[in-house]
């Protein structure tokens, strides 16, 4: 059976860059990994492959949405460290339902029988959980992961995601494996002081601290993982992903989170320092 991870976080928080480097780190430790981008922008796997690949919705459209006419080779590409990649895609901006496409992608994966082929499957899911379609990966995941920064908007979104995971856990096996702190800045951004307090309050922990570093920005522009980059700070940037990969591959200590009510999170964060 595959270890299935669903990664969420506020829009623009760095989910795709983080997911790609985490997938690469697990692959470098010997795991066979599939990363699935669940965003109409279809750029989740760009750091792994160096290009934008055909999406599931593009391929389905070309065969008039007959699933039986689609093969694995039509939608899956292999990127850095042997990580297989797939992009669900979505409808044109301003039309259709992206959640429907996520559901169709999951259906296609089940048709292919891919859950038995991989050691790890990573769902990189867009923004906040805004509808049932985008929460679909939680129906299949062993663990949810939340990416967040040390600021109010990010923590507010993380709390909403904790609520989604808590609700899904009532009918499915999914639990929260932890929070990944991104763009950690100890000089000007408070490090992870707010995130640490939030994690403790909702019953989880910060499992990784990814620094705010220019090498990460440049890796995204280059369409590469951090492991392929050269320059100052490489070890500082790759170490958190190596540590998180070890943690996740070794059956993490997961919990069902206990999120705040929306009004309560406003009041709580205002008193944190």
Swiss-Prot record:
Pathway: Porphyrin-containing compound metabolism; bacteriochlorophyll biosynthesis (light-independent). Its cofactor is [4Fe-4S] cluster. Mg(2+) binds at residue 16. It holds the Pfam family Fer4_NifH. Gene3D superfamilies: P-loop containing nucleotide triphosphate hydrolases. GO terms for molecular function: 4 iron, 4 sulfur cluster binding; ATP binding; metal ion binding; oxidoreductase activity, acting on iron-sulfur proteins as donors; oxidoreductase activity, acting on the CH-CH group of donors, iron-sulfur protein as acceptor. [4Fe-4S] cluster binds at residues 97, 131. Binds 1 [4Fe-4S] cluster per dimer. One of its GO terms (biological process) is light-independent bacteriochlorophyll biosynthetic process. Keywords: 4Fe-4S, ATP-binding, Bacteriochlorophyll biosynthesis, Chlorophyll biosynthesis, Iron, Iron-sulfur, Magnesium, Metal-binding, Nucleotide-binding, Oxidoreductase, Photosynthesis. Its EC number is 1.3.7.7. The keyword Iron-sulfur applies. CDD domains: Bchl-like. InterPro entries: NifH/chlL_CS, NifH/frxC, P-loop_NTPase, Protochlorophyllide_ATP-bd. PANTHER family: LIGHT-INDEPENDENT PROTOCHLOROPHYLLIDE REDUCTASE IRON-SULFUR ATP-BINDING PROTEIN. Component of the dark-operative protochlorophyllide reductase (DPOR) that uses Mg-ATP and reduced ferredoxin to reduce ring D of protochlorophyllide (Pchlide) to form chlorophyllide a (Chlide). This reaction is light-independent. The L component serves as a unique electron donor to the NB-component of the complex, and binds Mg-ATP. This is Light-independent protochlorophyllide reductase iron-sulfur ATP-binding protein. It comes from Chloroflexus aurantiacus (strain ATCC 29366 / DSM 635 / J-10-fl).
């Amino acid at each position: 059976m595959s270890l299935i991870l669903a990664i969420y976080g506020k829009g623009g928080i760095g989910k795709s860059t983080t997911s790609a480097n985490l997938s690469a780190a697990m692959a470098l430790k010997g795991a066979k990994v599939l990363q699935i981008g669940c965003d109409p922008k279809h750029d989740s796997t760009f750091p792994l492959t160096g290009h934008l690949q055909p999406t599931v919705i593009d391929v389905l459209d070309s065969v008039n949405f007959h699933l039986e006419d689609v093969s694995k080779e039509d939608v899956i590409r292999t990127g850095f460290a042997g990580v297989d990649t797939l992009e669900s895609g979505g409808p044109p901006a301003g039309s259709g339902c992206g959640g429907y496409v996520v559901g169709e992608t999951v259906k296609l994966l089940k048709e292919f029988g891919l859950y038995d082929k991989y050691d790890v499957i990573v769902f990189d899911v867009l923004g906040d959980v805004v509808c049932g379609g985008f929460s679909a990966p939680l129906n299949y995941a062993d663990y949810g992961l939340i990416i967040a920064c040390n600021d109010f908007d990010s923590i507010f979104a993380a709390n909403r995601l904790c609520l989604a995971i808590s609700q899904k856990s009532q009918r499915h096996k999914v639990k929260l494996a932890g929070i990944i702190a991104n763009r950690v800045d100890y000089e000007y951004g408070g490090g992870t002081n707010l995130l640490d307090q939030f994690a403790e309050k909702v019953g989880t922990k910060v499992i990784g601290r990814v620094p705010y570093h220019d090498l990460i920005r440049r890796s995204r522009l280059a369409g590469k993982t951090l492991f392929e980059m050269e320059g100052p700070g490489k070890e500082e940037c790759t170490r958190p992903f190596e540590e998180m990969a070890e943690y996740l591959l070794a059956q993490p200590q997961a919990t069902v989170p206990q999120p705040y009510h929306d009004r309560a999170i406003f009041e709580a964060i205002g008193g944190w320092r």
